[in-house]
Regions:
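Short acidic (Asp/Glu) patches
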Residues: 31, 54-55, 96-98
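A short, N-terminal "cap"/entry segment at the start of jelly-roll beta-barrel domains
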Residues: 1-44, 143-171
Length: 171
């Protein structure tokens, strides 16, 4: 049986310590890219996301990858299609591509893993995070944003997503 070239690349061991990864201040939270598509031969991308209490990710849909949410600390209400789950530490929620989803962080804040499959080496979550964030000076949450995003900022994000073909904001 012939193996896919990306699968062969995934055979290289990768280890990322808890204090390692590419830390970015992203949309008011902290995103640490732990495993890239390149690291895993295109099998997955893993991003550790820490959010302030009350943060809401807008309703959106991915077209090229599936997204899993593994809650490490805190809590969030996660909606995927018609399913709503109050997720706490240790819970996992799977969001298949083409199904709209969103979350609202609970009063404890949260730290969770986004597990995206397959890992997209171009035009995926890694590119989106880098294009819409800044390097974190330390792997800590940024200050709480003083204001909500402006309509112009939201439209800019919508345009970026549409141009990439990766995802779409449904707001």
């Amino acid at each position: 049986m012939k193996q896919d070239a990306t699968l062969e690349k995934a055979l290289e061991p990768v280890a990322v310590r808890s204090d390692e990864g590419e830390a970015r201040w992203w949309l008011g939270g902290l995103a640490v890219i732990k495993a890239t598509a390149a690291d895993t031969g295109g099998q997955m991308t893993i991003v550790e996301v820490t959010e302030h209490p009350g943060v809401e990710a807008p309703l959106h849909v991915h077209y090229r990858d599936d997204e899993g949410f593994w809650m490490l600390e805190g809590n969030a209400t996660i909606e995927v299609g018609e399913m709503t789950i109050e997720a706490g530490a240790g819970d996992y929620v799977f969001g298949p591509r083409n199904i709209p989803h969103r979350y609202k962080v609970g009063d404890q804040g949260c730290r969770m893993l986004f597990i995206l499959t397959p890992g997209l080496t171009s035009g995926g979550i890694e590119d989106l995070i880098r294009a819409t964030s800044e390097p974190a000076p330390s792997p800590t949450l940024p200050p709480v944003p003083a204001e909500e995003p402006t309509p112009e900022e939201i439209e800019g994000l919508k345009s970026l997503l549409k141009e990439s073909g990766y995802a779409e904001l449904l707001i």
